[in-house]
């Protein structure tokens, strides 16, 4: 019975014989050095999705749910949306890894200078700023944080400092209108939705 070697097998055998011949002569074969593989920690990005109308949140929501479904730890914080049983103690858990936070106010916020709202928004902000510093989540969605700044519930400098000092592993996605220009300048990616083009 006759067997033939494939071209790959023949090349391997030839290479093996060459190495043996070099060793018998007291020489070492020139083998290209394999560089060690260096794994680099992924760096989180700051993304902004903004529009002058409703709609910038829906695409981000689907991205957050998809990330959580794939095992990422995701937090969505909606700063101006209230509802029944909301607040830090009433956060909703979805997909195993997604937490949804809203302030403990009975309705959506649209007016500045309400002390109860200020406390409720600050409670959500404190949780978010802790996540930004610690890096214990993979993705943090800050919905309507620009409006919270515009209404005076979160100082712009506080938001800027938290974003500048955030853990490098956290992806931050800011959605909604009225994003301060200083925050826009920090962004790695800005998506602006427009009508009538």
Stretches with model-predicted labels:
Residues 42-132:
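Conserved P-loop
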Residues 29-32, 121-126, 172-175:
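Short gly/ser/thr-rich secondary-structure transition/capping motifs
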Residues 51-52, 79, 143-145, 176-177:
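Fold-independent oxyanion-binding glycine-rich loops
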Residues 1-45:
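Extreme N-terminal, non-catalytic leader segments
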Residues 110-165:
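Phosphate-binding/switch loop-helix module in NTP-utilizing enzymes
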Residues 45-49, 74, 138-142, 170-174:
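Generic beta-sheet signal
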């Amino acid at each position: 019975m006759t067997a033939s070697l494939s071209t790959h097998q023949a090349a391997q055998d030839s290479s093996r014989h060459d190495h043996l011949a070099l060793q018998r002569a007291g020489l070492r074969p020139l083998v290209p050095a394999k560089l060690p593989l260096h794994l680099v920690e992924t760096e989180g990005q700051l993304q902004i999705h903004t529009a002058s109308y409703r709609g910038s949140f829906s695409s981000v929501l689907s991205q957050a749910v998809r990330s959580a479904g794939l095992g990422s730890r995701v937090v969505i914080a909606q700063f101006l949306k209230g509802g029944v049983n909301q607040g830090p103690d009433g956060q909703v858990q979805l997909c195993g890894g997604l937490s949804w936070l809203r302030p403990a106010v009975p309705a959506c916020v649209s007016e500045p200078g309400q002390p109860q709202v200020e406390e409720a928004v600050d409670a959500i902000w404190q949780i978010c700023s802790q996540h930004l510093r610690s890096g214990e989540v993979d993705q943090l969605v800050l919905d309507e944080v620009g409006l919270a700044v515009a209404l005076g519930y979160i100082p712009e400098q506080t938001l800027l400092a938290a974003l500048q000092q955030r853990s490098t592993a956290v992806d931050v996605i800011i959605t909604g209108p009225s994003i301060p220009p200083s925050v826009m300048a920090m962004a790695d990616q800005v998506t602006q939705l427009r009508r009538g083009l």
